[in-house]
Amino acid sequence: MSVVTRFAPSPTGMLHIGGARTALFNYLFARRNGGRFLLRIEDTDRERSTQEATDAILDAMEWLGLTPDEPPVMQSAQVDRHAAVAHDMVARGTAFRCYVTPEELQARRDLGEEKRQAAKQEGISDAEKEALLAEASQLLAPFRSPYRDGASPPSPDAPFTVRLRAPESGPRTVEDGVQGTVTIDASEIDDLVMLRADGTPTYMLAVVVDDHDMGITHVIRGDDHLRNTFRQVPIYEAMGWSVPNFSHVPMIHGNDGAKLSKRHGALSTTAYRDMGYLPEAMKAYLLRLGWSHGDQEIFTDEEAVQVFDVSGINKAPARLDLDKLATVNAHFMRLAADERLFDLICPVLSKNCSLSDAEVARIRAALPHMKDRGSTLIELANAFAFLYAKRPLELNKNAVKALSDEGKLRLKGLYDDLQRMSQWSGASISETIKSYCAATGLSMGQIGPPLRAALTGGLPAPDLAPVMDWLGREETLARIDDQLAG
């Protein structure tokens, strides 16, 4: 059997990180088993589905490199097929026309709740309470339609829905790749609506038909769909179709164990891109969010394909840890090719200011030595601020203190030696500074602070010799001269 997985988001909002993790798991499982990974956009909710959300989902998938093996399937394009299956099931006797109206169903639920509340009243006997709770339980139980047994319609032209004839009784079991053996009683399954009164298919029917028609062999999705599985399997059985293997993945919680919300960082996937995270880092982090393989913490794309299996997914909800994500991102930033990293930070740099060719050259020269200066692209881009700061530099409090009269006096002697240098390189600059210190009896602790203040204005920067090399002779001497003349 050739493995076929799918990711099936609804375009009612942006792709959040929980959905991105589900897509990743499906992608990796297909790749690990030499199968195909497909994408279906479940856009049957006409009121809430938008093209903007669809585009955002596709954009996020492209950014993560989770490319489907075939063009995306739009669920709304299959509505005629969905309806045909429902009518076929009616003909087979596994589905039926139901004439119960939404108003009647709501009245049933309201009456059930009314009786449940009445059972809480004081002054009623235990027998009355028991009777009320029994009636409430029956009214609020999964709905079994009176028309499932062939009751006549109220009128020849009465509107109807098409409902699944749910299994009568007995245990219903699903062997889940993550949750293990899960069993419920058939009485917990309702006669679910497959076609609405206007003839449009419901989600429950559409998912099953599409998964069958797309040849899906393994369904990996959030565990909020676990109960749906027991409602969907009877549709497969009614049509005589093979039932796919199911694996239901626990939800992602916040670092406090509470349900994930925006306060935990539950942003759209592309928001993390805008925050300066690399796609390979995002995938590596999401992979370990609820999945493990030995003691290894970080996986490359290639390693993940080689070892991923649903058996490594934990049953307990994973906890989002943005500090861990930042650590993983910093790791992949250090591994990234210099030219790619430069291209990625350019948009961030351009937001700060317009860079001259000379400033761009400085950043290119410094980049290989400064990859560890941030855990996101934004932090890294900001770390280069000292290279494109405009003269005369604005000094922070510590820089002003370092450039006291005594500090400037020490700096003046070094400035004269730097002017006399015939070759400008990190090594020659370092040697000149050492020679100056030896000749004057000063230590680096005495000359370093005023020199750093003059070159960076107090902004964070690496060792001084490479900084002066990246700035170049002209800019270095000009920055020092600005402070000596000030």
UniProtKB/Swiss-Prot annotation:
Pfam family, one: tRNA-synt_1c
Short motif 'KMSKS' region, span: 259-263
Gene this protein is translated from: gltX1
Gene Ontology terms: biological process: glutamyl-tRNA aminoacylation
This enzyme's EC code(s): 6.1.1.17
Family membership: Belongs to the class-I aminoacyl-tRNA synthetase family. Glutamate--tRNA ligase type 1 subfamily.
Gene Ontology cellular component terms for the protein in this record: cytosol
InterPro entries per record: aa-tRNA-synth_I_cd-bd (IPR045462), aa-tRNA-synth_I_codon-bd_sub2 (IPR020751), aa-tRNA-synth_I_CS (IPR001412), aa_tRNA-synth_I_cd-bd_sf (IPR008925), Glu-tRNA-ligase_bac/mito (IPR004527), Glu/Gln-tRNA-synth (IPR000924), Glu/Gln-tRNA-synth_Ib_cat-dom (IPR020058), GluQ/Sye (IPR049940)
Keyword Disulfide bond in record: no
Residues annotated as binding ATP: K262
Enzyme class: ligase
Protein name: Glutamate--tRNA ligase 1
Location(s), subcellular: Cytoplasm
GO MF, one annotated term: zinc ion binding
PANTHER family xrefs: GLUTAMATE--TRNA LIGASE (PTHR43311), GLUTAMATE--TRNA LIGASE, MITOCHONDRIAL-RELATED (PTHR43311:SF2)
Chemical reaction(s) catalysed: tRNA(Glu) + L-glutamate + ATP = L-glutamyl-tRNA(Glu) + AMP + diphosphate
Motif ('HIGH' region): 9-19
NCBIfam families registered for this protein in UniProt: gltX_bact (TIGR00464)
Keyword Zinc: no
Keywords: Aminoacyl-tRNA synthetase, ATP-binding, Cytoplasm, Ligase, Nucleotide-binding, Protein biosynthesis
Domain of life: Bacteria
Species whose genome carries this gene: Hyphomonas neptunium (strain ATCC 15444)
Subunit annotation: Monomer.
Predominant cellular place of this UniProt entry's protein: cytoplasm
Alphabetical list of CDD domains matching this protein: GluRS_core
Function statement: Catalyzes the attachment of glutamate to tRNA(Glu) in a two-step reaction: glutamate is first activated by ATP to form Glu-AMP and then transferred to the acceptor end of tRNA(Glu).
